[in-house]
Amino acid sequence: MTTGKEYVASVFEKVKAQNAHEPEFLQAVEEVFESLIPVFDNYPKYIEENLLERLVEPERIVSFRVPWVDDKGQVQVNRGFRVQFSSAIGPYKGGLRFHPSVNQSIIKFLGFEQIFKNSLTGQPIGGGKGGSNFDPKGKSDN
């Protein structure tokens, strides 16, 4: 019988191999996985049902361009992301982040954590997150 620690380690190795270029996402996954070891020790049925494999893979990731016109009339283009992680308990819910550092790894990390935040509300909502590397600082409303 597989222990919780063995299961978590095995799944995390697969996640690392598939997401090696996403350090923020991997850090969040590792922290959550470590905290779940006692759960898998107490409920081995979750291991049999591959709960972590289903939880850690987003249902959908959308990458898109965000064109906008600056105050000089020049078209600028930024990148946007929407990660929809889990609709198991309801429709996706999660905010938007606008910051120059935003990338797919950051949005995946935030969307992954949103699953757990939303589940604690008692509302039937799933987890997702969106954002863009657009920096709103110093931009006009024009």
Where are these regions (language model features)?
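N-terminal ligand-binding/catalytic initiation module
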Residues: 1-142
